[in-house]
Structure formats: structure tokens, C-alpha cells
């Protein structure tokens, strides 16, 4: 049977691209402009090989050692280069398509850029959305649409989400998380959580809370508030 590249079964060695404010998820896309010499080399090598790069978040305090090997988080996301264009001076524009979560086992030296042996992580409590209705998906879809109605780009984001065509609950939840406004630390928490149902429950609570804040703000704007002490 043909293996699914989104369902890894073994440990692999991949190049690492650590960034301070970018958290990447499976089943999402990430455009990147590659200009640093070490990462230009990384992309060139990757295009000749497996085509995969591991995106991973830098830990706080990275600024003092950015050109070296600042500390990184343990959990990242592997992506495949699905489009690329080479620019003058060896720079690149690339598009990564997210594949799967991974855990760094240990880093491997010998290259200009960082690389590591990683453990490919499988999803826990995932659901097939093509075979039976999912109350979790329906509830998340409903409150996410309410949230998007209040955004200037909400219609465009909803079209990009393509919520009706997600085949797995993990894909659905990761796409929604990717498009929801969260601080980097919270996005990393979602990346590190392998249990899909727990991710879905947490995301539901966060979107519901944001919708409540939006409603309160609108109610306050819709009426004149008297702050007089008399």
C-alpha cells in the first residue's frame, strides 16, 4: 500500500529553520523569503534532496546568539517546498506546505545551517470527517464564522479556510488555529498538543471568548454610557 507523506512512521533527519515569531502547522502554507547565506545553502540542498524543511520556534532570549545556535523549542512542524523561485544573489522565495509535527531528538553538526534527527509525531484522537458527521467540527465552524464576520478580511479568510473540504479533524483544527489571532506562545502550545480533541476544545473556548469581547465592545459603542457618580 502506498504510504501517505502526511502520516510519517519513522525518525528522519531534516534541516531546521528556526524563527522567532513563526509557528507553522500541518495542512497550512507558509511563504518565505530566504536571504541569509546559511539558509540559501539550506534551500539549495533541500531542493536537491527530500524537499523538506523543519520550521521551529526560537526560545526567548535568542537575540544575543542569533548568528550562532540559539536555543529552540522541542516541537516543530515539517514542511515540503511546493513552489520556489531563485532570485539574484542566490536568494529564494519558497512556499512550504505543512506536513506533520515533529520532536527534535538531537541536532547534527556538519552544515552551515542547523539540522536534526527528529521524531515524527502522529495525531491522537483524530477523526475522519468524510465518513460521519462531527459535532466538534460543526460547533467550531459556527463560532469561527461569527468571528470572521467582524474582520475586514473575514470573507477572504473563510474562502481560504475551505472548511467544507477538510478530510480530517486535525486538518480542520490546524487550519482554523493558523487563521485565528493568537500570540506566538499560544500558537506554540497548540503545536505541541498532539491530542486533536483537546486542541479543538481549547480553540473553541478561545474563539468563544473573543466573540464575547467583540459583542461587549459593540454593545458599549451602541449606547451612551454615563460614568457620572451622581
Short names for language-model regions:
Residues 1-230:
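N-terminal low-complexity, acidic/polar interaction/targeting segments
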